[in-house]
């Protein structure tokens, strides 16, 4: 499974990229707004750090506006992927953009039916929201499993599944077990994934043992 980082903070992106584990970035208007910087400036800088798919979201709600924004965003860098909301208008936009060779990531997916429609419209990626489904008492990982099964049934579907709205390391592991192609993970969760109490204990023990080794004067 591939790992993307879900943030617009360039310091977090640089750090995670230095670990050699991420191959893409997802952003959204909320994440960009937190940075307090010009949208295109942030996206440009992200593209200079990570040589992989960089998702940038449109804000228009009508297909015509989405298409216009998408064409403009696609000019920023060859790695730009356009995030489109899962609506009927969004599907119209995805259909047009896919024919123009512009990659799309259909976001805010909460059902297998939505994922199937997005794939049929030509989406490069679909992003089912695991955590938000869990928040309302549904099972986000079960949705990933459903979508994976449907896509496997039809080899002509080339759309990749991005497990999104990841809240903790267990979500990442369960998404991997379910067969998601990608998980897009907040930096704090990536940090959590590096840690285990027994690892810390082991390091401390090694250092104490090393101190006991006679040193040549």
From Swiss-Prot:
A GO BP annotation: carbohydrate metabolic process
Keywords, alphabetical: Cytoplasm, Pentose shunt, Schiff base, Transferase
Family per similarity comment: Belongs to the transaldolase family. Type 3B subfamily.
Active site, renumbered: 83 (schiff-base intermediate with substrate)
Keyword DNA-binding set for record: no
A Pfam family recorded for this sequence: TAL_FSA
Enzyme Commission numbers on file: 2.2.1.2
Functional description taken from the UniProt entry: Transaldolase is important for the balance of metabolites in the pentose-phosphate pathway.
Annotated SUPFAM superfamilies: Aldolase (SSF51569)
Localization (cell): Cytoplasm
Protein name: Probable transaldolase
Catalytic activity reported: D-sedoheptulose 7-phosphate + D-glyceraldehyde 3-phosphate = D-erythrose 4-phosphate + beta-D-fructose 6-phosphate
